[in-house]
Every structure is written in C-alpha cells, then in structure tokens.
From Swiss-Prot:
Keywords of the record: Antiviral defense
Biological role stated in the UniProt entry: BREX systems (bacteriophage exclusion) provide immunity against bacteriophage. Part of a type 2 BREX system. Previously called the phage growth limitation (Pgl) system, it confers protection against bacteriophage phiC31. The bacteria allows one cycle of phage infection, but subsequent cycles are impaired, protecting the original bacterial colony. The system undergoes high rates (10(-3) to 10(-4)) of phase reversion, i.e. loss and regain of phiC31 resistance. Hydrolyzes ATP but not AMP, ADP, GMP, GDP or GTP; activity is inhibited by the non-hydrolyzable ATP analog 5-adenylyl beta,gamma-imidodiphosphate.
Official protein name in the record: ATPase PglY
Compositionally biased intervals (Polar residues): 1228-1244
Recorded phenotype for the gene knockout or disruption: Strain is no longer resistant to plaque formation by bacteriophage phiC31 (a Pgl- phenotype).
Induction: Constitutively expressed, not induced by bacteriophage phiC31, probably part of a pglY-pglZ operon.
Domain of life according to the entry: Bacteria
GO BP term (any one): defense response to virus
Region Disordered: start-end pairs: 1205-1263
UniProt biased composition (Low complexity): 1252-1263
Originating organism: Streptomyces coelicolor (strain ATCC BAA-471 / A3(2) / M145)
Gene responsible for this protein: pglY
Length: 1294
C-alpha cells in the first residue's frame, strides 16, 4: 500500500524559519515599512475589528477630553500584539494599504474623524525588559525615538542636569571659557555683536554663569525660547541642549542608561507632551511592550517593584492639571501582574503592591486580543493548502483522523477550559495540529518564551519535520519540548528558571540517554533516521529509532506537563491522554492496545527515575513528573553497601510471601486457602531447590500427614545454578522414592533478565535505605540539607513503590503466570511445576496473580488427593464452611429424620446454606422450600458394614474412614462428624462412649474420636403409646412423641429420673401406713384401698428403675416395664395421685397427734364416730379422700370433744380457803426453812372449744385428773399455736 504524500506536498512548508518570518518588533511596527509588512499577512477577524474599534475610541475620547488615557493590550503569547500596534499605526497615519483592506471598512466608517480631523500622532515604541527605571526607559526612549525621526529637533528637557553642569564647570576651569563657548557651537564675540541686532545668539561667560545658576523648571504650558533665550530658565534649557548636542554629545546616551538621570515620570510626561506638540503632533501614543514582564522578572526585589508599580498611574494622572497634548499609553501584557504578586510575594509587601496595582488597574482600560482566533490565523499564515486538489486531500485526511475513536478524539479537541477553541472546525483549520496541541503551545510559550510567537513555533516544527511528516499524521505534543528547549530562551521568573533548568538537565543527562541505551542506538543514528531514513539499512537500528522517537515524545510530554501544569490538556495527565496527545507515536498490534503499552513504559520509567510517578487508578491510570533537582543518586550510592546476597534473598522472600499470602509459622511457612468451600493449609518452603545444602531432602518433605509441601525457588541464583538444575534435583529425588511418593511439588521460576535483576538490586538498596530513618538521615542522606533530605526521601519512597510494582510484575512472568517479556525475564524456561507424585492437569493459569496462582496449584493438588470431595462453594465466593454452619444444617437434618415423611420446611434464611452444604454432602436435597432427607449414607454405611462383616457398634473412626470410600473425599473432621451424626439420625442410632449410651446425644463439637454408634432396640408401638400415656398421667410430664432410638433413651431417662424422684417418698408412705394400720383400721391383706395402692405404686417405681444403667436394652425394658405393669382395677390417675402425694401424706401421718386421737376412744359415742370417720378416709385412696385433711380435722374435733366433756363434768367451785399467814406458821418444826405453802385457786376450764387458748396457768389437782386436764388444755394450744414453746413444771404437794 502506497504511503500518503509528505505534508510539504500539499502545504507550503519552508525549509527553515527565521525570527523575522513571524515576529514583528515594535520598532518596525511604528514605521511605514513595518506597517506594510504587518498588513501584508495580517488576518482580520471580527474580534480584531472590535479591538481596533476599542483602541480608536480610546484615542478619540482622549483627544476630545484632552486627557491622558491608558489601556492594557491583553493577549497571551503569540496573540499578535505587535502586529496589532503596527496596523493601528497604519490606520492612524492614513496608510493607503490599510484603507485598501475592505475588512477595515466598518471601523473606518465609524471613525471618520481619522480622515476628516487631520490629526497627527507620534507613536513611540518601548521595550521595557532591561530598563533600570520607568523614567529611564520612557523618557530616554522618547528622546532616542524623536532623534531618529527629527534629528534637528531640540532635545526635550527630561534630564537631571547636575552632572552635566558639573562637567561644564570643570571644563571652564581647565579649558577656559573661550574653548567651552567654541565647543558649544557659537563664535564668541562676533556672534555677540550679531545678537545685539537680533540676528543670532552667542554664548558669553556671563550668559554661562546665568544659565548654570538658574533653577531647573519643568512647568507645564510654559514655552521656552531656545532660539533667542533671554530668561534664566531659557538660558539653562539652551545650555542643556547645546551641551548635549555639541559639547558633550555622549551625555544623552549616558543619561539614558542612568536610572537617576531623568526628571520624575510625571514631569517628564508633561515635558515630552510639550515637546511632541512643538513638533506638530496632536497626540502622543506610547506603546510599551513587556512592561508587566519587566516587573515580573524583578518581583523578588519588592522595594523596586513597589516603587516602579506606583508610577504606572502617571500615565493617566499627573500633578499637572493638563498636559500640552493627550498622552495615550498602550501597555501590552500577557499576564496580570496582580496574579504574579500573589504567587511570588507575601505579607505586607504583597498588600502594598496589590493596592497600587488595583489603583492603576481601575484607571486603565483593557483591550483583549483573543487566542481563539489563532486557528484562523495559523491556517491563513501556515496551513493553507497549495491548491484545490491539495485541499481535498487534507479534508480526506482530516475525516480519517475523526475516526480515531471518541476518547482519543475528545482528548485531541482539548478541554472546554482551553483558550484556542475546542471544536472540529478549529481542528480542521489547524490540522495537523490538534486543538489540544494549540492550547499547550499557547500556555507553554507564555510561561517560557519571550521572542518567538506561537506561529513561529508551529512553523519551526513543520520545517524540522518537513522530510518525515506525512499527510494523515498529527504533530505530537511531545515534539514541542525540543523546539522550546533548543531556543535558548529562559523563563522570566526565578522559580520557573529553576524548574526549566531541572527539566532540561533531567532530559539531557538521564531520560534521553536512557531511551537511547534502551534501544541500543546513538544520537547519530537518530539524526540519520530523521534526515536520511533511507540510508539506515540495519532493521534493528531502524526499529530502535522508530521506538525511540515515540518514547521520546511521551517523555517530552511529561516534561511539558511539569513545566506548565496549568495547561488543561496536561493537568492530571492520564495514560490515555498521554497517548492521545501523541497519537500515532506508539503503535500497537491491536488497535486500542496502545494504552496498555504506554502504561507499561511509564511503569518502567517510574521504576528507573524517581521524578516519574504513577498516579490514578487501575481503571484510569495516570502519570506525573516532578522536578526537584535533588541528587537522589548520591543517596543511593551511599546505601549501596546494602546490596548483598542476604538482603536480596530476604527481600525476594518477603515480596513472595506478601504476594502469595504466606503466613510465617513456628516450624514452617504455611499457605492458608479455601478449596471447594473448606479451609485448607499447605506447607511452604523457600530456597534454591538445586542446592542440596540449602534445601536438604527432609526439608522438601511435608511435616504433617495429609498436607502438601510446596518448595518455591527464587527467580535468581547467586551461584551457577539455573532452573534446569532445579528440575534435575527434583527428578533425582523422584527416582529415589519408591512406592507412594511424598506430597511435594516444586514451583520453579525463570530467572530475571540482567536489566530487571539490576532494578531489583536497586530496590534492595532503596528499601534498606528507607527502612532505618536515623541511618537515612545520618549516613545515606547526611550530606543533604534538611529540605533536600525530605525531598530525597519522598522521591525514593515513590521510586520504591514503582520498583516494587515492577518487581512484582516481573515475578509474575518468572513464575509462569504472565507472558514472558525478554526485558523482564529469561524466556527460555517453562517447566515451572515439578511434583514428586504423578498429578494430572498440573498447569498454571495464565493471567492470575501469584496469590491466586498458588491457590490454583494447591487446588489441583488437593483434587488429585481427594477426587471425590464435594464442592461446598458452588458460587465460588471463596468462603469456607464453618462449624457453626454445620450446627444449623444438622438441626434441620435431625428434624427431617424425625418427620414421618423425612421432609421438613426450612426457614428461608437457611435454605441457601442447606443447598450449599447438605446437598453436596448427600445428606438430602434442599428444594424451593422443603428439605428432603437422603438415604445415601445409610445405604452406604450399611452396605460397607455387611461387606466387611462389621456388627455391633460402628465407631466414629470406622465411619469416617468409610466416607472416603470408594474414592477419597478428604472431608475436614467437623464435616465428617456432620455426616456421621446425620447417619445416626437417619438410621435411628444412639451414641455410645466407652460402651455407655450418651443420653442426651452429644452436640457435633462434643463428639469424641472414640465414640461409636449403636442400634437402639425399640419397644412395640403399643407399648410405646401405653408407656407415653401412663407416664404423662402418672408423673405429669410430657414424654417424647417419636418412637426412635434416641427418643427411647430419652424417654427411659425421663421415666427413671421420675421414678427415682418419687420412690423414697412412696416407700415412706407405705411404712407410715403400715405403722399405724391398726389404729387406722387398715386391712393389710386387702387388694384395694390406700395401703394396697401405696404398695403397688412402690412396686411400680421399683420396676421402672430396675433396668437403669443397662444401656439401650435397659432403656427399652424400662419403657416396656411402664407399659406392662399391672395396674389392676385401679386407674393410672389414682396411681399418679398416690405417687405424687406420697411425700405430703407420709409426712402428715408421721406427724399426726396420735395420743390425742387415741383419747377419742374414751369419749363415748362421739369419739367413736370421729375415729370411724378417720378410718374410712384412711382406707380410701388419696384421690378419693385426702388423709392429710382428715388427720388435722379429726385432731381438732377430738380436742373440742374433750373440752366439752370436761366442762360438763366439773362441779361448782368451793368457797375459797383462807391463805395462811406468817402468824399461822409453826416455829416448832424441825426444819430451819419453814415456808408458807401456796395453793393456787383452781380456774374453771372453758366450756367450749371457742375462744383464745390459754398461754399460761397453774392449779392444784389430783394426779389422776392432771393427765386429762393437761392434755386437753395443751391440745387446744397446739392446734392454735403449734410452734409455741412452753415450759412444764410440776411437784407433789401432799
């Protein structure tokens, strides 16, 4: 396919560009020739017509008001300020060429005064850079300009004459007055005579004395006659003029270079206005270029800037009420000085300068020359096709460019914040320069350049690439940097100078040499490729030069982004935008893959140069270049001692451990991972596999049964070994192992390339340097000052991150997880996995990370080891099943096993869990809502038991082993226990430990290794139902419903516990009833009644506990005992009442007042009736009559009967006997302690049982009656106050 034509074939491109091609100096702009030159190529736009209208209106207003006015002519670099002034000069001077341009008709029609008023203007250009003061450049520049226009015109009086007059006085003293007068240009006496007749003027010594003694005067509006001066002021002015012209002609030139050689700017403006008027001008127009730039270059001399800035207002205001003619000043500026002051100055100085600038800005008009018309100007001046056919070719190429894709297209158009327009039409005008390029050009040029316009830079780029740039190719933004850097211009601020110099140094000493060495080419090769590509026949060098050119453009774009970060296209630069700005510079085999290629290049550069930093995100990566000027290499050189084998191995192991996710254990490193939904562990060992001293055979063997050991070699060897020797070592070990080989696998990497290994060693040095902050500050970076140490540390930290990222990427290739690149690894080794056992399908998965890759390998190993392991993570969530999950699953499995149809509805929250665990484990099937139990494990275990002749208990160990039949499943212990426990529920088996049934059944976590499962014999269903009914009736508790082995044990345990709880009380009841059977009239031979039921109840309880502790068979017998016990004619309800009330009844019988009750027999018919009633209750069972109530009631009734009987038998009281006194005491008794006997008066007892029981008393009575009386009285007290404590005292008195 034919190549497109060179761009020079369709657009006129000069071979070389000179400054005069596009730059118009101010001196030229204010001359007829300069105006003609400007008009010839000038492109008039609508906006420029508005600008001319603004300028002319300002001039007209100044003339009409006879007031000085000023305006900022604001425009960025290359916006055509000089051309504007040249055309303005042509319009003001009535130039025919200007009037012939029809584009100016609207302006000339509006400003007809230009042709009708006959006004004459003096336009004075100024270039302010290098000025020592405003007066020096403005006033001195005026004198210089006027001398060129009118050599005969008198010199305006703008100089301070102190030094001039001192020189004249010295010359008079040395040479004499005659010689001085002659040198002033007069003939002495002869001229004096002519003067008397008014025909001429001649100096005399007297006139010299008068002139030298006169005061300097610059009063506005005062005309000085210099032809025939007569006043002292006129003589002084005449002397200054003649001396400057004839006697000391170098005075004005010397004064022009002296900042103190001029009068004040305010006075000077009045002087030159008067002077211009004397020359016949109606207005004085001052065009000052670079005034703001001049102040900006001196911004750090705050006093100077403040002084000079305060003078700016003199252009519109002055001490004089009115100048001779209006002074109109146009001050060109690219940047508002107020912005620069804010950036470069701080504090009170900033405030003072800002106030001054604000004052001036408020009095100045502003005419803005837009950059947005630059596309039209560039098209007209540079990019116009040669002819119609060429225009069609350019249009076709542009349409092809529009197909680059939306993201690239948007980047090429630039940002809406751009200054040059951002639409397709603008792009078409500037093609092959994109709007983003144009915007960058304007910003960069404004920041760095002074003497070259944007058009010149564009022309220079076209000229430089005229032999290689073809139609359809865009001019890359990166090509702009070399053009700017080679120009020799420096930025106008010190801070930018430092950054620019740092960028230039970085590019020339590091970046460009690195790119050249990367492709093994030289500067001569590049020069040959650019200018004589056909002569470059070496394909390798040709491709290297092509790759270098693209990379160089990218690097130069990064430098531009650091120099002008405010450019929208370069701000927060992304990889995608970096490629788009240099569209076509990086070629990819697949369209759209350029971003990945550039991203890899940037990552490599960031690892090499600390100034380059990767930014952004994985989805939208970016890059930033920071210029600091800090000597980082010296810090690295000081830390070079850390580059040793030990540190290299340690860092490699650390990086691999972090990437692989390896945990450091006490005995070995371990890899924790999830495989098929279960948590697993593999053993890891790092080392040189080929070195048997470093890794002996025993270090390659797994330490724990069932685990795999993965030996990971490092991607470099300090000795002579390589990956092939690593493979040979494993093969030798494999041959030595016979039978079942060890579960060992070696992961062998390819070695790093020489370049990448050098980068890794650099990473070791930087990592160690940054590891110890104290050592970094005192040893490695001790030669730097504190600020540079901090910057160096930040740069090294950034580079460490880049090198880490690079190393990890290279490691990924080395271990076979990414496509091997010769720049990163040695690409001749692919046998990365070598296992001792034969493992099918043992391959690496391309594109995985090291973290995922090793888990993929470990999963393959476990698949080989446990081929039948179920997948408990079907959704690949990477989460492992936990014991808490199995507890929930088991609860639902048990519930299903207890259901008659083997299915239950599972709560919605647990259905996902049942699908994940129960299904793959073959415990059952979880459907939409219901879980249905499976018979798989029951059939599986029973079949194995039959085939192996196993009877009796099935141990947990045996059943766990059987889960690996016919193929190993390798279930974790807690999952194997879940399976066995589920089988226990399915097959209705009970857990036994040490031969004893575990009741209740243990939780999953409580199952021990030596536990076993036993078949539980079941009672007949009728017995089960009868026992359940009787248990609930007799004992009042709820029995289990399902007739299952575990339930039988549970039920038996409930029966036995209940029987044991009541047995002793039932026995006590029988004992008490038998002890009082005679009194209560109980027939001990009867088959019915209370005593008979109590005895049968005791027999029932004894029968229920007889089989306790006899295992599963005993449990069955216990249930059967309850079901088969002969209750006789008595219902279970009455048995239950007898048993449950046994304790209370036995206690009542034991504590009954039998002596009181026995008295009833001697109380006649009433007493006998009471006893008969009590005995009838005692003979009936407890459900029929409550014996406790009967005993208490009978006691009360007996006591009441006794009281009634006593009251009826007591005679009337006898007269009270007189009590003996001391006089009645006989003294003839033999005792020495005679006493008066006390005889208590008998108190009659209450006639009824009512009333309050006596709490004390005493009487004299006979012994026979005392028993009955005391018993009756105390019985009543016992009834009313059973807990009262009493004291009994008695003695024989007769």
């Amino acid at each position: 396919m034919a190549q497109p034509p060179l761009l020079r074939d369709v657009i006129d491109i000069k071979e070389s560009i000179s400054t005069s091609d596009f730059v118009l100096s101010l001196a030229e702009a204010t001359t007829p020739a300069g105006a003609q030159h400007a008009l010839r190529d000038y492109v008039v736009t609508e906006r420029l017509l508005e600008n001319f209208d603004e300028a002319l209106a300002l001039i007209k207003s100044s003339l009409d008001g006879h007031r000085s006015k000023a305006a900022y002519l604001h425009g960025s670099f290359g916006s055509g300020k000089s051309h504007f002034m040249a055309v303005l000069y042509a319009l003001l001077s009535g130039d025919q060429a200007a009037r012939a341009r029809t584009e100016f008709d609207p302006v000339l029609t509006k400003h007809q005064w230009l042709s009708t008023d006959g006004k004459k203007f003096l336009l004075v250009p100024y270039h302010m850079l290098g000025a020592k003061a405003l007066e020096q450049r403005v006033l001195g520049g005026y004198v210089t300009h006027v001398k060129k226009l009118c050599p005969e015109a008198p010199t305006p009086q703008v100089y301070r004459t102190d030094s001039l007059f001192a020189d004249i006085r010295a010359m008079r003293a040395n040479m004499g007055d005659e010689a001085v007068i002659r040198a002033l240009g007069t003939s002495g006496a002869d001229d004096a005579e002519e003067d008397e007749w008014g025909e001429g003027f001649a100096w005399t010594p007297q006139l010299l004395d008068t002139a030298l003694a006169a005061e300097e005067s610059h009063e506005a509006g005062v005309h000085l006659n210099l032809t025939n001066p007569s006043t002292p002021a006129e003589l002084r002015a005449k002397l200054v003029n003649d001396a400057g012209t004839n006697l000391l002609p170098g005075f004005t030139q010397n004064a022009a270079e002296d900042e103190h050689g001029f009068i004040s700017l305010d006075a000077g403006l009045s002087v030159i206005a008067e002077h211009a008027k004397s020359l016949g001008y109606d207005g004085l127009i001052l065009f000052m270029d670079e005034l703001i730039l001049w102040l900006a270059t001196l911004i750090h001399d705050q006093k100077f800037v403040a002084r000079e800035a305060s003078k700016i207002t003199n252009f519109v205001e002055g001490g004089d009420a009115r100048r001779a003619i209006p002074v109109m000043s146009f001050i060109a500026r690219q940047r508002d000085l107020r912005e620069l002051v804010g950036e470069e100055v701080s504090g009170a100085a900033e405030s003072s300068i800002q106030d001054t600038l604000n004052l001036a800005s408020g009095r100045f008009d502003k005419i803005t020359l837009e950059d947005r018309k630059l596309p039209q100007i560039a098209h007209a001046r540079l990019l116009k096709p040669k002819d119609a056919e060429a225009a069609q070719q350019v249009d076709a190429a542009f349409e092809q460019t529009k197909r680059v894709g939306p993201q690239v297209w948007d980047t090429l158009l630039g940002s809406e914040k751009g200054t040059t327009g951002a639409d397709a039409e603008s792009f078409r005008l500037t093609y092959p320069f994109s709007p983003a390029f144009m915007d960058t050009l304007v910003h960069i040029s404004s920041a760095l350049q002074r003497s070259r316009t944007g058009l010149k830079l564009m022309g220079q780029l076209l000229a430089d690439h005229r032999d290689e740039l073809r139609l359809g190719q865009l001019v890359p933004v990166g090509d702009l940097y070399p053009v700017i850097a080679q120009g020799g211009d420096k930025p106008f601020t010190d801070s930018l100078k430092v950054v620019f110099e740092a960028a230039d140094k970085l590019y020339k000493t590091k970046l460009r040499p690195y790119l050249l060495s990367s492709y093994d080419i030289t500067e001569d090769d590049v020069e040959q490729y650019r200018n004589r590509p056909e002569s470059l026949t070496d394909p390798k060098k040709l491709n290297g030069c092509r790759m270098f050119t693209g990379d160089n453009r990218l690097v130069c774009t990064l430098l531009l982004s650091a120099l002008a970060p405010s450019v929208p296209a370069l701000s927060e630069l992304t990889i995608r935008r970096l490629g788009a700005l240099n569209h076509g510079s990086v070629l990819a085999p697949i369209p759209g893959a350029e971003v990945g290629i550039i991203k890899n290049k940037v990552a490599e550069w960031a690892a090499r140069f600390p100034e380059i930093k990767e930014t952004g995100t994985d989805a939208n990566p970016g890059v930033r270049l920071e210029l600091s000027g800090v000597d980082v290499d010296s810090v690295i050189a000081n830390a070079q001692v850390n580059d040793n084998p030990g540190n290299r191995v340690a860092l490699a192991r650390r990086l691999l451990s972090e990437e692989l996710g390896v945990e450091h254990g006490q005995l070995s490193d371990q890899l924790g991972f999830t495989w098929r939904g279960t948590a697993r562990t593999a053993e890891i060992v790092f080392g040189n596999v080929a070195d048997e001293d470093e890794l002996p055979d025993h270090d390659l063997m797994p330490q724990e049964e069932g685990r795999w050991r993965i030996a990971i070699d490092l991607p470099f060897d300090e000795g002579e070994w390589g990956p092939v020797e690593d493979v040979n070592r494993v093969q030798r070990l494999r041959e030595r192992q016979q039978g079942e080989r060890s579960r060992t696998i070696a992961w062998l990497p390819a070695h790093l390339s020489a370049t990448r290994f050098a980068d890794f060693r650099r990473l070791v040095v930087i990592d160690k340097a940054l590891a110890d902050e104290h050592r970094f500050d005192t040893q490695y970076a001790g030669h730097l000052n504190a600020d540079n140490r901090s910057r160096a540390k930040g740069l090294l930290e950034t580079q460490r991150e880049a090198l880490l990222k690079q190393a990890k990427g290279a490691f990924k290739q080395a271990y076979g997880l990414a496509q091997k690149q010769a720049a990163d690894v040695v690409p001749d080794f692919d046998d990365h996995l070598v296992a001792l056992p034969d493992v099918d399908g043992l391959t690496l998965s391309f594109g995985q990370s090291l973290h995922d890759g090793i888990r993929h390998v470990a999963g393959k190993l476990l698949t080989h080891q446990y081929p039948a392991h179920p997948d408990l993570d079907p959704d690949a969530t990477g989460t492992a099943v936990k014991p808490a999950d199995t507890k929930k699953v088991f609860a639902h499995v048990r519930a299903a096993a207890e259901a008659r149809d083997g299915r239950i509805e599972v709560p919605a929250a647990d259905r996902k869990l049942m699908q994940r665990i129960a299904g793959p484990l073959r415990l059952g099937q979880q459907k939409e809502a219901y879980f249905e139990l499976s018979r798989y494990w029951g059939d599986h275990f029973r079949q194995l038991a039959r085939s192996q002749g196993v009877t009796g208990d099935l141990s947990l160990i045996t059943l766990t082993d059987w889960t690996d039949r016919p193929d190993p499943r390798g279930l974790p212990d807690f999952l194997a226990r879940l399976v066995v426990a589920a089988f226990a529920e399915m097959d209705d088996r009970v857990w036994v430990r040490g031969g004893t049934v575990l009741d209740p059944a243990p939780e999953l976590a409580a199952i021990k290794d030596h536990d076993a499962l036993r078949s539980q014999p079941l009672p007949a269903e009728s017995d089960w139902d009868t026992a359940r009914q009787r248990f609930e009736t007799v004992f009042g508790a709820k029995p289990p419903a399902l007739r299952r082995g575990r339930m039988v044990n549970q039920f038996a345990r409930q029966i036995i516990e209940a029987a044991r709880d009541y047995r002793d009380h039932a026995a006590d009841l029988v004992h008490q009833l038998e002890a009082h059977a005679s009194f209560l009239g109980l027939d001990q031979t009867a088959d019915t009644g209370r005593l008979a039921l109590a005895r049968r109840s005791l027999q029932l309880l004894d029968a229920l506990t007889a089989e306790a502790g006899k295992g599963a068979a005993g449990a069955k017998k216990t249930v059967e005992a309850l079901a088969s016990f002969d209750l006789g004619e008595t219902s279970a309800d009455r048995y239950g009442t007898s048993i449950k009330k046994a304790r209370a009844v036995a206690e009542a019988v034991a504590s009954a007042p039998w002596s009181t009750l026995e008295l009833a027999a001697g109380l006649g018919p009433e007493g006998e009736a009471l006893l008969d009633s009590l005995r009838n209750v005692a003979r009936d069972d407890q459900r029929t009559a409550d014996l406790r109530d009967a005993l208490a009631r009978t006691q009360r009734e007996v006591v009441a009967l006794i009281k009634r009987t006593q009251a009826a038998a007591t005679p009337p009281p006898a007269p009270a006997a007189s009590q003996p006194t001391a006089g009645d005491l006989s003294l003839d008794t033999p005792t020495s302690d005679p006493r008066i006997p006390y005889t208590s008066q008998e108190t009659p007892t209450s006639s009824g049982g009512a009333g309050t029981a006596r709490t004390s008393g005493g009487r004299r009575t006979t012994a026979a009656r005392a028993v009955t009386d005391l018993q009756a009285e105390l019985s009543d007290l016992a009834v009313r106050h059973p807990e009262a404590t009493i004291e009994i005292t008695w003695r024989v008195v007769e």
